[in-house]
């Protein structure tokens, strides 16, 4: 047999055989690109360069263009989408016979297809990869031949230092040894002092650059990454055990993950390079591999990038530690036990890693039951705190209050228009018709609609009643003696869902003179005995249960026999869930002397119910159609149409057996089966005084809270809540108490008790680096909006009013927990199109904080003043010194605070 080609090809060969982009063959021309790049400046947009020559612009403005995209069809060099001119995009949009959709980023060496609107992957063996390799070699050779370009800032600093040295030399013609030492120390300070550098924009990557600027000014992160890179010391892992905790020392033999190494390389380059602008292409590519959503050079969110970056490095470090743990435990435990232990550590977040050590903190949610006053705790880790902006709460209140009013209005309109579904609109009525004819037509249409709805309703209910009657009726009990029932209290309410009983208030009828009683509020039938003589029926508002007997036919008069009325009876639960409410205004009397039946018209009559329809039905069945006196002939037609349905309903109701088994219970317990246990969070019940359960590290009442400030956002985030209604607490203590009181009738079922409770979330373990996220981007209904209001934030933040009284990593007796601001990320513009910039504080590293991270020892006395430093505003590659007031007036989106020790 002959082998098929491509069956044993490696993965890279498959990529060559099946290219991802279908436009690759037509949009790639090697010869044209190589000819176009002879003796040209690759890092400059050729259109911008031509415009600058015409306009005589400065070189600084042209240098701000972050990225250059090379057309792989003709070799055109244009600026990217994030620039103002967008020459590369305009070059693609120019109509041509062949597509110029494939471009290459000269800084990052990534290919992009405009038609696919996606990145084009390639390898070295492919045609595109060979061209990229050729261009990279040409770029390196050109850089070696050309002189090293020094940034403008470094040139300025070198000129300043040379002038200062010359001044010192000319001032002192005979310098002594001390002057030489001072000059040497000054030059060393200039060289060792931390600097601020710009970052190249790789294509709408300002969100990435702003985060990287703040992380580069976090000295503790660089120290921890250096420790991770060298892995000198073994990692100690605490093995929690009920009997005796053990300490396991793990030697990390494996190298850190690719994202961690890229982060270490980026921070090293930021601190040690002499360039004024750094290109973080390797780090950004590793982030895109971890999170595909950041591919494509689209506008993204800085807070999401920070979370993905930290979570990615944390996952790599945890994986490295768990592999070392499994190797060290192989000699004593089985593989299955090791897997269980590792999973348990991951759930408890007890595996040490540098991300949790620096950015990680802990929130504690305290919940107290208002019935038994049991205090329970829930611990939740955090890497940053997302704080709601106060303006968002007002919008939520308005959005919550408006829909119910609209719904009520719509329901009222539906109820009003329900009777007019079959009525023509006013505009359709001819203007020549008289008002009397219009009213008559509307009345006729309404009555016809009522009759149709009546038939539809009783068709469903008749079938339902017949099915229930077959289940509930007993064959032995055919006749039940007449009894009177006692009245039910007004406040008694049925317990079954959907229970609608039927009441009728019957007034006395003497010698054919009938009087209808008004004001019937209940819906149960109160039927008294009907005799053949001139007897009055018992009237009044007596609520009685109904078991209707059959209506006898064959005589001219109606003989109503009411049988089977029992005392204090309710409908069975199977009937309660299905029977609809039926209002009846029955007019029943002694009809021996009167053969005529008058049906009084009522304004609104419920379909298929009432003595009117029953009497008219009986008269029609007996052949006395003339005895029915009505004003409208259409009403008679409606009664004739519904006569059969009413008769079937009456026969079905006769077979209903009424029971009084249900009683309203006072125990507020929701019984759920074992399979439907509510998904609740596990709480740790603690023995704590309810009076001090919600106490904080310092008093919250004396806070100078402004309406729109970070303090107000923190106060709103940690305020005390009351859990009521659907948010009630599932209290295990109350459940056990209630279960002990109940009888053992419901075996095999668990009973859960929900009670009102109080809840408050506070910080129980502060993080060394506190990151605050202000939720400016909100979703209001189907629209997205940004809150542009200025939120005040302090330079020194005291977190003690928002921490628990038993807060960890705080010295005893300390009532302050101070943080110093060192970084801000600002978002300007709207949600659709905006720009991220960074404010960073250039300062010396906090040695006390680094000591606490490595040793775990907390100094007894913390600092009260922030360290000295200078602030800079960085927008991609542009760096500018600013004042503190400019920083505090910015529209902050992310705030970076460092703990003061």
Curated annotation (Swiss-Prot):
- Binding of Zn(2+) 3, residues: 71, 74, 91, 100
Task: Provide ranges: composition bias, Polar residues.
Answer: 482-494
Bias (Basic residues) ranges: 436-456
List where Acidic residues composition bias occurs.
410-419
Please state every residue range assigned to the domain named USP: 197-900
**Could you give the domain comment from the record?**
The UBP-type zinc finger binds 3 zinc ions that form a pair of cross-braced ring fingers encapsulated within a third zinc finger in the primary structure. It recognizes the C-terminal tail of free ubiquitin.
What's this chain's function? Answer: Specifically deubiquitinates 'Lys-120' of histone H2A (H2AK119Ub), a specific tag for epigenetic transcriptional repression, thereby acting as a coactivator. Deubiquitination of histone H2A is a prerequisite for subsequent phosphorylation at 'Ser-11' of histone H3 (H3S10ph), and is required for chromosome segregation when cells enter into mitosis. Regulates Hox gene expression via histone H2A deubiquitination. Prefers nucleosomal substrates. Does not deubiquitinate histone H2B.
**What is the protein name stated in its UniProt record?**
Ubiquitin carboxyl-terminal hydrolase 16
Gene encoding this chain?
Answer: usp16
């Amino acid at each position: 047999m002959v082998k098929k080609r491509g069956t044993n090809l490696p993965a890279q060969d498959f990529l060559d055989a099946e290219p991802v982009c279908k436009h690759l063959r037509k949009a790639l021309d090697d010869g044209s690109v190589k000819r176009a790049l002879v003796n040209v400046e690759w890092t400059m947009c050729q259109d911008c360069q031509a415009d600058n020559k015409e306009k005589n612009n400065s070189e600084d403005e042209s240098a701000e263009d972050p990225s250059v995209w090379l057309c792989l069809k003709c070799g055109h060099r244009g600026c990217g989408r994030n620039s103002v001119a967008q020459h590369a995009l305009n070059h693609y949009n120019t109509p041509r016979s062949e597509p110029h959709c494939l471009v290459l980023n000269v800084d990052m060496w990534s290919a992009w297809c405009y038609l696919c609107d996606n990145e084009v992957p390639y390898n070295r063996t492919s045609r595109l990869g060979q061209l990229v390799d050729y261009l990279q070699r040409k770029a390196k050779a050109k850089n070696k031949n050309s002189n090293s370009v020094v940034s403008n800032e470094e040139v300025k600093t070198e000129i300043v230092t040379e002038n200062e040295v010359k001044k010192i030399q000319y001032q002192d013609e005979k310098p002594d040894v001390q002057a030489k030492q001072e000059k040497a120390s000054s030059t060393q300070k200039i060289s060792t002092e931390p600097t601020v550098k710009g970052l190249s924009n790789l294509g709408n990557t300002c969100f990435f650059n702003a985060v990287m600027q703040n992380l580069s000014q976090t000295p503790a992160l660089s120290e921890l990454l250096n420790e991770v890179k060298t892995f000198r010391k073994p990692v100690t892992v605490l093995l929690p055990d009920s009997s005796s905790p053990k300490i396991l020392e793990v030697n990390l033999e494996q190298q850190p993950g690719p994202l961690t190494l890229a982060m270490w390389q980026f921070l090293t380059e930021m601190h040690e390079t002499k360039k004024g602008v750094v290109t973080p292409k390797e780090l950004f590519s590793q982030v895109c591999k971890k999170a595909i959503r950041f591919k494509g050079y689209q506008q993204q969110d800085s807070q999401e990038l920070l979370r993905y970056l930290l979570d990615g490095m944390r996952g790599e470090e945890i994986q490295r530690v768990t592999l070392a743990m499994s190797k060290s435990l192989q000699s004593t435990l089985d593989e299955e036990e090791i897997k269980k232990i590792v999973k348990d550590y991951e759930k408890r977040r007890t595996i040490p890693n540098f991300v949790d050590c620096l950015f990680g903190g802990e929130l504690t949610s305290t919940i107290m039951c208002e019935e038994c006053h049991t205090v329970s705790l829930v611990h939740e880790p955090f890497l940053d705190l997302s704080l709601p902006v106060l303006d968002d709460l007002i919008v939520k209140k308005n959005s919550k209050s408006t829909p119910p009013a609209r719904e009520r209005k719509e329901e009222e309109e539906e109820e009003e228009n329900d009777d007019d579904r079959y009525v023509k609109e006013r505009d359709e009525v001819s203007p020549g018709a008289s008002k009397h004819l219009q009213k008559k037509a509307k009345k006729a249409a309404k009555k016809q609609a009522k009759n149709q709805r009546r038939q539809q309703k009783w068709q469903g209910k008749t079938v339902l009643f017949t099915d229930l009657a077959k289940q509930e009726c007993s064959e032995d009990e055919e006749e039940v003696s007449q009894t009177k029932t006692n009245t039910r209290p007004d406040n008694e309410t049925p317990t079954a869902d959907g229970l609608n009983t039927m009441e009728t208030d019957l007034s006395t009828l003497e010698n054919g003179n009938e009087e209808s009683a008004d004001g019937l509020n209940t819906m149960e039938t109160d039927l008294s005995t009907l005799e053949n003589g001139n007897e009055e029926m018992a009237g009044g508002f007596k609520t009685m249960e109904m078991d209707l007997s059959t209506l006898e036919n064959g005589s001219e008069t109606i003989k109503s026999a009411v049988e089977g009325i029992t005392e204090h009876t309710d409908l069975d639960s199977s009937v309660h869930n299905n029977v609809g409410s039926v209002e009846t205004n029955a007019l029943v009397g002694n009809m021996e002397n009167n053969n005529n039946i008058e049906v009084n018209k009522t304004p609104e009559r419920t379909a298929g119910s009432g003595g009117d329809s029953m009497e008219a039905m009986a008269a029609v069945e007996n052949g006395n159609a003339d005895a029915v006196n009505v004003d409208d002939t259409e009403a008679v037609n409606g009664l004739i149409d519904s006569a059969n349905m009413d008769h079937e309903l009456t026969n079905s109701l006769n077979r209903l057996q009424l029971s009084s088994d249900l009683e309203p219970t006072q125990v507020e317990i929701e019984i759920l089966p074992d399979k439907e246990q509510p998904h609740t969070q596990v709480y740790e019940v603690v023995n704590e005084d309810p009076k001090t359960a919600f106490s904080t590290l310092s008093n919250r009442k004396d806070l100078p809270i402004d309406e729109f400030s970070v303090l107000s956002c923190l106060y709103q985030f940690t305020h005390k809540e009351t859990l009521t209604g659907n948010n009630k607490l599932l209290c295990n203590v109350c459940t056990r108490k209630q279960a002990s009181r109940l009888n053992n009738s419901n075996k095999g079922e668990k009973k859960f008790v929900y009670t009102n409770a109080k809840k408050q979330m506070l910080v129980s373990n502060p993080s060394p680096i506190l990151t605050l996220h202000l939720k400016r981007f909100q979703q209001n209904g189907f629209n997205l909006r940004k809150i542009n209001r200025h939120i005040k934030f302090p330079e020194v933040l005291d977190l003690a009013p928002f921490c628990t009284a038993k807060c960890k990593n705080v010295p005893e007796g300390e009532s302050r927990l101070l943080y110093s601001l060192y970084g801000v990320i600002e978002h300007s513009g709207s949600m659709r199109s905006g720009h991220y910039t960074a404010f960073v504080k250039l300062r010396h590293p906090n040695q006390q904080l680094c000591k606490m991270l490595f040793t775990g020892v907390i100094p007894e006395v913390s600092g009260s003043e922030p360290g000295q430093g200078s602030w800079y505003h960085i927008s991609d590659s542009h760096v500018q010194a600013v004042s503190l007031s400019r920083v505090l007036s910015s529209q902050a989106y992310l705030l970076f605070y460092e703990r003061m020790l």
